[in-house]
Amino acid sequence: MTYQVIDYYVDGALAYITLNRPADLNTIVPPMLDELEHAVGKAIRDRAVKVIILQGAGRSFCGGFNFSGGFTQWNDEIATDGEWDAGRDLMMVTSQETGWVPRFMSLWRSPKPVITQVHGWCVGGGSEMALCGDIVIASEDAQIGTPYARMWGCHHAGMWVYRLGLAKAKELALTGRAVSGREAAEIGLINKAVPFAKLQDEVRSLADKLASIPSSQLACMKLVVNQAYDNMGLSTTQMFGSVMDSMMRNTPEALRWIEKANRESVQAAVAERDGPFGDYSQATPANKPNPANVVPLPSQRKAG
């Protein structure tokens, strides 16, 4: 496979999978999920690779699903004659081959540990993807959240539920409030937050330590933990969440909102959504990620 929207780079025992649409905040487009799953499989099959690092190029990890153009780029999967088809949407989101969550979960299923490195914006589907990694380390000023809680979507990977206790899971599910990397670490959503200047070195240091452990040992420990969460109903929660997500993308309110994004602009739609809360697009500069914090492609960093 030739990668269009990700970058795959191996440095010794580490495989870097980098979301590579920096001009668009690495928002998710149809090829990205196929390429992600393929790259994870490539790292799994490479016996020299011990650890996978997932990151985003440019100013952000991932700005969520790309819905410019009214989400029509997904019509091949969810529409008939240009109109939303509930049956096709249901088939798409619940299929192991085409569903968004099963492709995110290639990170979870990988026998090799996955470290997700988060900076900038990590929202919506981008946060669902990030949290499927085993260990998540973020910059302190990263902004992580699920704005779809307010309009046009629903939890589908379940990680926001399983990583948090009931109180925070409910609060963030109902408000869609963004949390900084620092707060995400404090509430246990992610493992650690560090200043951006230390982020890449922090991730590399942990990856090198994990790479010193036999791969079979890591695989067995990961499998035991994963199985415990499967026993708690993770897969059924994901199936239910995916179906709910397909419905909530197509309520009258959601359709009016996505039409506003198509007719006026994505910026106008998210401003309407976020205005009462004063976050995401409407946050003050102090509550937004520093736009100067940029992650290069691994090959560029090594060359530099």
Where are these predicted regions, by residue range?
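Conserved CoA-thioester-binding segment of acyl-CoA-metabolizing enzymes
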Residues: 1-57, 294-304
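Crotonase-fold acyl-CoA enzyme core
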Residues: 6, 105-218
